[in-house]
């Protein structure tokens, strides 16, 4: 799943240099402060995010709109769908 919409996100999160579980904790905190329907673009370089961020979205009911995990930094675009 790839997209060029990362720059159009309502919010940006730089998780580069952070290691598990910090990136997902930062994503969760960011999403808590967002309105329904807003988007969050994430940049990360911890390989565990390739598993953890999609799992977080499924578990919490948010949409992983796009991801680019072919090379670092990994990028994700999430839409907040649940309060």
Curated annotation (Swiss-Prot):
It is found in: Cytoplasm. Its main location: cytoplasm. It comes from Pseudoalteromonas atlantica (strain T6c / ATCC BAA-1087). Keywords: Cytoplasm. Disulfide bonds: none annotated. InterPro entries: Sulphur_carrier_TusA (IPR022931), TusA-like (IPR001455), TusA-like_sf (IPR036868). Belongs to the sulfur carrier protein TusA family. Signal peptide: none annotated. One of its GO terms (molecular function) is sulfur carrier activity. The keyword Cytoplasm applies. One of its GO terms (biological process) is tRNA wobble position uridine thiolation. Gene3D superfamilies: TusA-like domain. It holds the Pfam family TusA. CDD domains: SirA. One of its GO terms (cellular component) is cytoplasm. NCBIfam families: PRK00299.1. The active site is at residue 20. This is Sulfur carrier protein TusA. Sulfur carrier protein which probably makes part of a sulfur-relay system. The gene is tusA.
């Amino acid at each position: 799943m790839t997209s060029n919409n990362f720059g159009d996100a309502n919010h940006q999160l730089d998780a580069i240099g952070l290691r598990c579980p910090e990136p997902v904790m930062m994503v969760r905190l960011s999403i808590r402060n967002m309105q329904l329907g807003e988007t969050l673009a994430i940049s990360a370089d911890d390989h565990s995010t390739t598993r953890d961020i999609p799992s977080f979205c499924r578990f919490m009911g948010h949409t992983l709109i796009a991801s680019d995990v072919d090379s670092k930094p990994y990028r994700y675009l999430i839409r907040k769908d649940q309060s």
